[in-house]
Amino acid sequence: MKKVWLNRYPADVPTEINPDRYQSLVDMFEQSVARYADQPAFVNMGEVMTFRKLEERSRAFAAYLQQGLGLKKGDRVALMMPNLLQYPVALFGILRAGMIVVNVNPLYTPRELEHQLNDSGASAIVIVSNFAHTLEKVVDKTAVQHVILTRMGDQLSTAKGTLVNFVVKYIKRLVPKYHLPDAISFRSALHNGYRMQYVKPELVPEDLAFLQYTGGTTGVAKGAMLTHRNMLANLEQVNATYGPLLHPGKELVVTALPLYHIFALTINCLLFIELGGQNLLITNPRDIPGLVKELAKYPFTAITGVNTLFNALLNNKEFQQLDFSSLHLSAGGGMPVQQVVAERWVKLTGQYLLEGYGLTECAPLVSVNPYDIDYHSGSIGLPVPSTEAKLVDDDDNEVSPGQPGELCVRGPQVMLGYWQRPDATDEIIKNGWLHTGDIAVMDEEGFLRIVDRKKDMILVSGFNVYPNEIEDVVMQHPGVQEVAAVGVPSGSSGEAVKIFVVKKDPSLTEESLVTFCRRQLTGYKVPKLVEFRDELPKSNVGKILRRELRDEARGKVDNKA
């Protein structure tokens, strides 16, 4: 496919990037922390950590992993916490030790955590105490040998940290009891690491940096193997696209999206480290009044988010009173940005929401609307520099211009493959082209618009939910005979999970089924709607017709609207 989109690039956006500008993320990090040493890198709960402090603490943590725990280059280290100052310290410590970061959603259930730890072969985990009770239930069934435990306030000044830890544990009761007698405290790890020798590993661009887990059409979470080069390439692609709006050493980005999610990891954490910017870490973005109070304290210049976050902010009266004069970048992704939200955003802030599209397997950015656009296009924008895109039919032939086809992408940001899953890798990457599973159309300027999903994936607040996983869990309930899970439109989260169930036990209730699911699934995966049926529609070979149920369920929602 001819790169027609290049003609629509703003004049100061390059058509190609250099993915080999740095040898590794460690090289990028070390150059930035030296260049911006005394400037603030992260702020959380009013506590500022400079680039110099970040360098010192991450070096100490890397030394502890190497010398204190005896871990080697290539070992996997899991990281399970919300946005706290400990996160970047641990993240860059793991990378600087030559190890591979395995990001874990802290809201995972024991079942989900056990799978990810075993699949990745993680030998250590850094976890905040609020979720230690989850780890306790499964740690003995995994290869994890070392548990490094931190508390919410451990990277704050002594007085503030002590107060935060007390309030979190005893007043808010956010730390369920746990028993991990061999755990090492994060503070002790740093204290000991300062006295140990750090040995910078020899890293090459093709070394793995992250195993970033994502669902799959099989419903089993798989680790996308993202190399240092993959991440650096996407970093340069994002920088090339947004760069004209950004000023090195002078940015403050609002990071309400969790850093364990690939969107915030690349666009907030890594990009603004390279640019010498400051990350305002929001630990609990669901507390909108608390988030707005934080925003009022800082002249933020950039904000990233998903549609649900922007919508919640727009509906907050205090947010409407904020000063937006410093803001010059608003980036939306993870799920489609609704037109009404985009229009309200520009009316209030004076800035257009630049919607983009990506997936974990692409580190993540594939396309984004150009920064000079002055309307809400409803599209996912143009492919980013050094990225090829084509639309194909079911036989892998390119479709005619303007016709829908599966979006396929090729570029330096595309993952190596899925960790220890060659068959799944071969299904998604063919001749270097990653098949996204999304059906798109491209207009004459190169703007892409997603029209459907080939996969049955459900997108809840920017998180992928795979029907097979939901169905596997529901089928474990003794009162269920058959189940099908689909996504239906939701005003608050984009989509919500609905299940159609055929009962085995006539006394089965919606309430008991949802309660059962809550024990097995992270909150956003739990079905919000349950409909009991005498039978489910099936194909002539007995396959449940999810699409038929989905169309029917969406029709009901549309009719109600």
UniProtKB/Swiss-Prot annotation:
PROSITE patterns: AMP_BINDING (PS00455). It is a peripheral membrane protein. GO terms for molecular function: ATP binding; long-chain fatty acid-CoA ligase activity. Its EC number is 6.2.1.3. Gene3D superfamilies: 3.30.300.30, N-terminal domain of ligase-like (3.40.50.12780). It catalyses: a long-chain fatty acid + ATP + CoA = a long-chain fatty acyl-CoA + AMP + diphosphate. Pathway: Lipid metabolism; fatty acid beta-oxidation. GO terms for cellular component: membrane. Catalyzes the esterification, concomitant with transport, of exogenous long-chain fatty acids into metabolically active CoA thioesters for subsequent degradation or incorporation into phospholipids. Activity is the highest with fatty acid substrates of > 10 carbon atoms. NCBIfam families: PRK08974.1. This is Long-chain-fatty-acid--CoA ligase. It comes from Escherichia coli O157:H7.
